[in-house]
Amino acid sequence: MTSAQQQAVDSAQSYLSEGQGFSEQGLLSQLTSSAGDGFLMPDAEFAIHYLNPNWDQQAVDAANGYLNEAQGFSEQGLIQQLTSSSGNGFTQAQAEYAINHVYADWDAQAVDAAKGYMQMGGFSQESLIQQLTSSSGNGFTQAQAEYAASKVGL
């Protein structure tokens, strides 16, 4: 192992142990980005292959991080965040694994999302439920959205 490869391995291990949850794409970007570590692509790829992380567990870690932020993620919204190239860049299978291996109170997540919208103001019960259930919005189920609307006083 070269010195540069060892440094890339050490850096990758540090990122992976933080518990944030990195996808392979995300870790590779972090290691090679000039705003990140700036390693050469071959050294970063070596580090990732050398460490052979459990990407499913990384997806679970990322999902837990989002769920703990109190932003209000639906199951659909969380999958979109995890798989988006502008989000985490996990595969669909890794995101679905994460969804199936996190404890998520989707009703509570809907309430968190509803509280965020109510801070912006201007929502009727109907418009809030529509926003929460919209596939271009949050993607909560009708029942989750109705529960959230009732919990924020609508």
Task: Specify the residue positions occupied by each region the protein language model found.
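An alpha-helical, amphipathic repeat domain used for nucleic-acid recognition
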Residues: 1-154
